[in-house]
């Protein structure tokens, strides 16, 4: 597992003040900051997962979702993750070929197939989770325990708001 550092923009020959200003003075301040943090959190981990396990983002997201919910359709996974349906469909085919998922007809909707994770898929998921936990800690270490609880409450509220 590689250690990913949150490098200062000054190391890339940028004026730190200008860099900080973009986070404070723009017309979509919260959106930009959330996007920045999300990218800093997940992109390095997905690069590591691709290098170490040969999995693309959609493929791992299938494992993640099916590790927590026993049966899902590809559309369910696309809806839960915000990933495009076509990237999830490609991921389903690859994960079926590699033996990480099984597929069966959906008795409620003949056009859909129900996906389940195999024991091999569960094991792969268990191997990958620590990579995310390490990266999460690298990002969240700037917060004390009260701030982490507050962040957790705020994120739960935003995710639960059912915003389109």
Predicted segments with their positions:
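Short, locally clustered residues in the helix-turn-helix/winged-helix DNA-binding domain
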Residues: 39, 64-68, 129, 156
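Charged, amphipathic alpha-helical coiled-coil/dimerization segments
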Residues: 9-17, 93-153
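N-terminal helix-turn-helix DNA-binding core of bacterial DNA-binding proteins
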Residues: 25, 42-87
């Amino acid at each position: 597992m590689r250690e990913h550092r949150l490098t200062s923009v000054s190391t890339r020959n940028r004026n730190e003040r200008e860099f900080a200003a973009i986070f404070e003075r723009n017309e979509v301040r919260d959106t930009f900051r959330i996007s920045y943090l999300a990218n800093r959190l997940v992109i390095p981990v997905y690069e590591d997962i691709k290098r170490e396990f040969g999995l693309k983002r959609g493929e791992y997201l299938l494992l993640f979702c099916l590790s927590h919910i026993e049966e899902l359709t590809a559309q369910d996974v696309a809806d839960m993750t915000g990933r495009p349906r076509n990237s999830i469909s490609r991921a389903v085919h690859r994960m079926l070929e590699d033996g990480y998922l099984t597929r069966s007809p959906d008795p409620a909707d003949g056009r859909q197939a129900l996906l389940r994770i195999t024991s091999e898929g569960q094991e792969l998921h268990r191997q990958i989770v620590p990579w995310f936990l390490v990266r999460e800690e690298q990002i969240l270490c700037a917060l004390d325990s009260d701030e982490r609880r507050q962040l957790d409450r705020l994120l739960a509220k935003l995710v639960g708001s059912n915003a389109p």
